[in-house]
Amino acid sequence: MLFLLVVAHAIAVLIFGCGFFPQKKVLDGHAALDGTHARDPVFDKLVVVVVDAMRSDFLFDASISKFHFIHEKLADGSAWGFTAHSNPPTVTLPRLKGITTGSTPNFLDAILNVAEDDTSSSLLAQDSWLWQFRNNAGKRIRFFGDDTWLKLFPPVEANEDSQTMFDEYEGTNSFFVSDFTQVDLNVTRHIDRQLRETSEWDVLILHYLGLDHIGHKDGPYSRFMGPKHEEMDSIIRKLYDELDMQSTLLVLMGDHGMNDLGNHGGSSAGETSAGMVFLSDKLAAYKPSKEQSSAKEFPMKIPSLNAGEEKTFHYLKKIQQIDVVPTISSLFNVAIPKNNVGVIIPEFLQLFKDVSLQKAIVKENWNQLSGLTKGKTQIMEETKNFVIEDVIKNMKDVQENLAKTATDYNYPLLFIGCFLSIVITGTIYYRYARHVAININTSILIAIAALMGISVFGSSFIEEEHQFWWWIITGLVLLSMVNLNFSSWKSHIIVLFCLRLIRGWNNSGQKYTYDNVIANLLKGNIDALWWLNLITVTVVGLNLKSLRFGNHTVSLLGFSDLLSMGLLSMITFLYKVNWSIVNGERVPDLFYKWVLETASLIVEDATLYREEDLIHTALIPLARIFFKLFFAVLVSRLMIQKFFQVSDISKSLAVVSRYVTIFLVFQTPSHNIGLFLFFEIINEITVHIIRERYQSDYLLAVIFGIILQFFTFFQSGGTNSIATVDLSNAYNGVSENYNIYVVGLMMCISNFAPTIYWSFYNWRITYANANSSRWQTLVAAKYPFIIIQSTIGCCLLLACIILRYHLFIWSVFSPKLCYYMVWTIFVGIIVHWIPEILLLLT
């Protein structure tokens, strides 16, 4: 019954989510020019180069930018630069949707491909400048780069209506964040042939991923970032030098930016500030923006920030990224897409020398926007008596209002989901109250649930949720020290010391970042990092204490566990070192030699490879060896346990948890592996304290474990922002032909590894001293997490309804709701219930 209530609550949250993230309504059909003002296109060819995650300062700031050719062109006026604001969610798919259709993306676009009225994942049937170029202007389009474009505009064999947008194409995979070299070379290798065949295409689109991958891997100030800037700059130079730039418009843009950790998806200034540059010889004859005209030099030297002052990433003129859509449409004389919310960039109007033509273009943009306002603005019939600047200002106001009202909530689903959540939570509380007496532990549980529930009504509390769990965990340890003599404090002091180290390991929360966190210090000292990792892996894999058994048969089983865990730990360490080498990180020479020797053993014809290539080649096979061995050993262990009828369930669960811990370390970033050493210390000490001082109080163990699940999730770098989702370990052992569901599961395991570790914490106490059946023990241990989660859920759903027009509804509350869904389904059901049920059945 309790499990059914948990599933029902998850369904209620999903129902609410369907109402909160509804499919966005779009206008059907395609726009057409009114034909009243005939004009020729300003340019004949268009080249669009998208550099994924190219933040504005990467292009314009003297302290970081290496785009030397772009700087030359900005200085002589043949390049016009802008800071392009990209609306959140700042991930590639919704941003490409905005860049091509001019529409504001729904937040759900960051999670579900593209959800439109026809429930299709493509934009083939929706109006876009690509559709206009292809169908109304007869342009031939070629594309090479991020295969997200091919999801939006699938080739003919992938769609039923036999439409296709690209005459020639090749996609590169966008999620192998470890690769920032080959992924770009796979795009660049097409350029020479395209330059030879300029008569056979009109539009060329290139989308480079390497810079984004460097950001994810090593942050915006990585040592690889400068060379990548220069590589991208050389590509622009090559295109510019070999194309006819009088008749060609070259647009260089980022689809979004990145934060100071190198991630994106949120709404920080760095994530929403993408660079954009238009290049053509023709532009030199006209005036750029006044901000560019007044700039003294390129790249721009920005004054140092004062203490506490945040970087704005505002360079030159700031525009909306979607403004590129009506601008390109007008310059190439095609209709502005029906669902466009962009406003033509005013500086480009001067390329139309006839003032009446400029007014006609502005009128087209105004009337197109008016079609989206549901009659709130009037269609413009005449162009004689208006001032262009005034109309553009009014269009900006319309744009702002349209962006705010882009989503219509499905209120019936919102209220049904919220009502069900409240009813189910009330039922859970009622059932819990019938079985549990009120004492200090239950009071602490209810207080934590109430505190965390109330906190979701504040946007800052959501952004800094880690602070709550820090004070809760330290408060609980300090409370345990009350009435203890000084000599008994030692173990508590050690726990507090370990907690403080964990607290300072990574940047946590969304408001503040610090340079000197432990993870960054370790990255700067490779010897300390890797020796700590070796010690951690050894401690995790060779924890002899959990392998002590009574009789001869089980002792033999324990010895086999010791060998298996030792082998898995060794492979884990070698793989993490190998992974770091492949990603351009330095490692101690000794460990480099170990990896090289290992690679020579597992790669066929190893003597034919250079050292570097040999290590690269060994990466995926080494990971697959680990996975095969892990699952073979785990299944064998459970079968042997069943065969020999090992009755001590607590010991069996402890051994299984050791195997899973090794797997979690394997899925953890190198700089976070050391956390598990302190997890182990806290685990051993607190289990001893609960057994000795609290007579193995299972409820206290469960509550303490839950707090640590949340606390360590945030202190390992997690937040309530999509920007901190780590993909770097989602592809361990995966080649290009991957299963998205497997990768998704691996991503969840990687990001929630500390949480999964502490979900097993109470097993050693709960099952070792159980006075009731296994199943009654299981249910009793699950109530506290369900109490906390359901309380938070009820409050969060209410907060999303009450604050649905809040300024931060999409940047703070929506990501929190998405994270809550993951906590409910992945952690609350998959992690908390399924493994334990399967183990109890054996």
Curated annotation (Swiss-Prot):
Question: Which InterPro entries does UniProt cross-reference here?
Answer: Alkaline_phosphatase_core_sf, Phosphodiest/P_Trfase, PIG-G_N, PIGG/GPI7, PIGG/GPI7_C
Which Gene3D superfamilies does this UniProt record tie to the protein? Alkaline Phosphatase, subunit A
Q: Where in the cell is it found?
A: Endoplasmic reticulum membrane
The GO molecular function terms of this record are: CP2 mannose-ethanolamine phosphotransferase activity
Known SUPFAM superfamilies for this protein? Answer: Alkaline phosphatase-like
**Keyword Membrane included in the entry's annotation:** yes
| Residue positions with a glycan | N186, N441, N506, N551, N578, N771
| Chain segments annotated as transmembrane | 409-429, 442-462, 468-488, 524-544, 554-574, 615-635, 698-718, 740-760, 783-803, 821-841
Q: Pathway listed for it?
A: Glycolipid biosynthesis; glycosylphosphatidylinositol-anchor biosynthesis
- Membrane topology per the record? Multi-pass membrane protein
Question: What's the protein here called?
Answer: GPI ethanolamine phosphate transferase 2
Q: Which organism is it from?
A: Candida glabrata (strain ATCC 2001 / BCRC 20586 / JCM 3761 / NBRC 0622 / NRRL Y-65 / CBS 138)
List the top taxonomic levels of the source: Eukaryota, Fungi, Dikarya, Ascomycota, Saccharomycotina
